[in-house]
Design a protein with these regions (language model features):
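Solvent-exposed alpha-helices and their adjacent loops that cap or buttress functional pockets
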Residues: 1-4, 26-27, 76, 102, ...
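Class I S-adenosyl-L-methionine
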Residues: 1-108, 117, 139-141
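Short, well-ordered secondary-structure micro-motifs
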Residues: 47, 94-95, 120-121, 143-144, ...
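Short, structured loop/turn "capping" segments at alpha-beta junctions
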Residues: 109, 126-131, 172-176
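Short, glycine-/small-residue-rich phosphate/pyrophosphate-handling segment
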Residues: 115-147, 154-158
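A contiguous loop/helix-start segment that scaffolds small-molecule binding in enzyme catalytic cores
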Residues: 2-9, 22, 80-81, 146-223
Length: 223
């Protein structure tokens, strides 16, 4: 971080935003722009007031990047922009496209624990050999192979999308865990010893979820 750093990309724990906790609390007094998901922004609206600009993150990544580029060009040393994202923003998060677009030295990154970490803590499993995939992007599917996997999903249909992808590639699924609303009041973990068809999957899946599974070689898996 340098004196020119005016944009701060801050990871948030799944429990939510805490305005009184560093590093967020270190920057709020000079904040002019806050970017984040709906549940990240709401706790800060009353704290920061109407003079601060709020921009929600949905599927509008180009808009977010363009707004931060304008903020960096405005070069106001007494003002900050804050970007809030769950976990580590540079790990399957909004931080990657922002870091690729912004000038070097114009931003800092403050990671929180990732949802992968939190998932395996709940399961009581080591995860240093786990492969990670994401279904947030529709442009490229994870390159599957046998082993223990964790998947970031795109919502309540995510577990079906993951299982469909794996089964259609001819692999088997064992020891699957569906982890919902990690760190929140509605936290829930459901286990499935074996998944041979998506018909056994529940319909009441919460939108914020992770899927952990062991992918096994199948008789007809695609190479």
């Amino acid at each position: 971080m340098t004196e020119k750093t005016s944009i701060h990309i801050i990871g948030v724990e799944p429990e939510g935003v805490n305005p009184s906790r560093a590093p967020l609390s270190d920057y709020l007094s000079k904040t002019a722009l806050v970017i984040g998901g709906k549940r990240h922004l709401e706790p800060l609206r009353e704290v920061l007031g109407k003079e601060v600009e709020f921009l929600g993150i949905t599927s509008n990544i180009p808009e977010v990047v363009a707004r931060l580029l304008r903020f960096a060009e405005e070069s106001k040393p007494d003002k900050n922009a804050i970007v809030l994202a769950t976990g580590d923003p540079l790990y399957y998060g909004i931080g990657a496209p922002i870091a690729a677009a912004l000038p070097a030295g114009s931003f800092s990154v403050h990671p929180a624990t990732t949802l992968v970490q939190r998932s395996f803590a709940l399961l009581g499993e080591p995860w240093e050999k786990v492969s990670v995939g994401s279904l947030h992007s529709k442009k490229e599917s994870p390159k599957l192979h046998p082993g223990r996997w964790a998947f970031y999903t795109g919502g309540s249909a995510g577990v079906r999308e993951v299982c469909t992808l794996v089964l259609e590639k001819g692999f088997g699924i064992r020891k699957m865990a569906l982890l919902e609303e990690i760190g929140m009041a509605g936290e829930r973990v459901r286990h499935f010893e074996k998944v041979e068809t998506i018909g056994i999957l529940p319909d009441d899946v919460k939108a914020l979820n992770m899927v952990v599974m062991t992918i096994e070689e199948g008789s007809g898996n695609e190479k």
